[in-house]
């Protein structure tokens, strides 16, 4: 048994029906880790790594983190007196004339160096990903619940000017940002096409009709998927990438279509003389949830993947429920609520599951939009706006914790994680 707290995390997780684990903090102290950095070779770069790594470990909720400079030889006796369990030393090394980011992980209890992890410095601005990978190494050493989501890319559409949006990539903290599609057009609604994050779909408004394109990041190539008058948006991709759900409006009113990426065929799966949009896969890709105005206002419905299958209303609370995402049998959605004490309309995130009528509120103020599950369903990212801030939000469902990463000089139209 490495640490009792690890057992507690897994055990409580089995019985916590609403996935809140604040109780852990009162049961067992987290293992203490001291994050250090070396000033050799490139002190500024090492300091950046040190800052991101420390913040990643804090964000994970698995460590009690302290920070320090390199103290030379590891004084295990002194560290034991301080109740420190681990030391993570980040540095920049030079091998064969090339700089590399290096992590050394020391176990104070055993008095030994346990891990050495090298990450090539291909480009200086990629340092957040080096730090995220280091955090994953430290976390995996303790066999804590996975934080592999930290190394995933965010793809987003950013406003440039009237009628112009570019597609860019970022890390989850938004420290790293790089524009990859810039053509003075409206490029919107990006959606990852595969788990490897090598391709994504997006909508481009050209001279005539909106088009759904698939872009390969490595090859910088495009594939034309579909086009439609008025609306053409990919809203969900199946777990194996073989099928996608699209909102198209060839006859004026939008409906949800199922597209087979192998056969290159699309099938209409909703038929209603109103609005059916934003389909997201549910129940291991066997059904979908979607937004419809069948109730006279936007609400969440569910149906199997066939045109003749009936639709079932999932929510009977609220008068405007929209902007959804799903993971297995869980659905996160945006609910428009009454004006708050400041006269502002509030848009909050709520979480439901198909096997429970319980609605879990995830936010309490401001405008919270575009919720997106992580690939393991344990976390949600979203855009938060208040009079005081504009930020990318992160909710750790297992720990009932949230974080905000300020969005400076960037306005996001849509994103995927």
Swiss-Prot record:
Main localization (coarse): periplasm
Family from the record: Belongs to the TolB family.
Top-level division of the source organism's lineage: Bacteria
Gene this protein is translated from: tolB
Subunit note: The Tol-Pal system is composed of five core proteins: the inner membrane proteins TolA, TolQ and TolR, the periplasmic protein TolB and the outer membrane protein Pal. They form a network linking the inner and outer membranes and the peptidoglycan layer.
Keywords per UniProt: Cell cycle, Cell division, Periplasm, Signal
GO biological process, one term: cell division
InterPro entries for this protein: 6-blade_b-propeller_TolB-like, PD40, Tol-Pal_TolB
A cellular-component GO term for this protein: periplasmic space
Secretion signal, residue range per the UniProt entry: 1-16
Protein name per Swiss-Prot or TrEMBL: Tol-Pal system protein TolB
Function text: Part of the Tol-Pal system, which plays a role in outer membrane invagination during cell division and is important for maintaining outer membrane integrity.
Family matches, as Gene3D superfamilies: TolB, C-terminal domain, TolB, N-terminal domain
Compartments where located: Periplasm
């Amino acid at each position: 048994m490495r640490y009792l707290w690890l057992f507690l995390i897994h055990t409580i997780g089995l019985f916590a029906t609403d996935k809140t684990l604040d109780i852990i903090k009162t049961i067992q102290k987290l293992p203490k880790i001291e994050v250090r950095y070396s000033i050799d070779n490139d002190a500024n770069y090492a300091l950046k790594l040190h800052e991101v790594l420390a913040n990643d470990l804090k964000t994970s909720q698995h460590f009690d983190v302290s920070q320090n400079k390199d103290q030379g030889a590891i004084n295990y006796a002194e560290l034991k007196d301080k109740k420190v369990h681990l030391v993570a030393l980040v540095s920049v090394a030079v091998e064969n004339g090339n700089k590399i980011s290096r992590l050394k992980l020391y176990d104070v209890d055993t008095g030994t160096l346990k891990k050495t992890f090298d990450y090539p410095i291909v480009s200086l601005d990629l340092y957040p990903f080096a730090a995220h990978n280091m955090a994953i190494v430290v976390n995996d050493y303790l066999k804590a619940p996975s934080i592999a989501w930290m190394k995933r890319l965010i793809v987003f559409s950013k406003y440039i000017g009237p009628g112009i949006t570019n597609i860019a990539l970022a890390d989850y903290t938004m420290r790293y940002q790089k524009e990859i599609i810039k053509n003075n057009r409206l490029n919107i609604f990006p959606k990852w096409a595969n788990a490897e994050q090598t391709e994504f779909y997006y909508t481009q408004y050209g001279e005539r009709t909106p088009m759904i394109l698939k872009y390969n990041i490595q090859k910088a190539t495009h594939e034309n998927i579909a086009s439609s008058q008025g609306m053409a948006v990919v809203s969900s991709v199946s777990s194996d990438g073989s099928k996608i759900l699209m909102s198209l409006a060839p006859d004026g009113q939008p409906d949800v279509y199922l597209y087979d990426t192998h056969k290159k065929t699309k099938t209409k799966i909703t038929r209603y003389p109103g609005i059916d949009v934003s389909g997201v896969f549910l129940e291991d890709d066997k059904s979908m949830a979607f937004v419809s105005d069948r109730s006279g206002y936007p609400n969440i419905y569910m149906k199997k993947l066939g045109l003749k299958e009936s639709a079932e209303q999932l929510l009977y609370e609220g008068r405007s429920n929209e902007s959804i995402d799903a993971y297995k049998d869980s659905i996160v959605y945006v609910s428009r609520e009454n004006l708050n004490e400041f006269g502002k309309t509030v848009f909050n995130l709520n979480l439901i599951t198909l096997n429970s009528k319980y609605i879990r509120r995830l936010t309490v103020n401001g405008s919270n939009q575009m919720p997106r599950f992580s690939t393991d369903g344990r976390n949600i990212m979203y855009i938060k706006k208040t009079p005081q801030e504009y930020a990318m939000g992160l909710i750790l469902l297992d720990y009932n914790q949230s974080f905000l990463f300020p969005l400076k000089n960037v306005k996001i139209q849509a994103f995927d994680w």
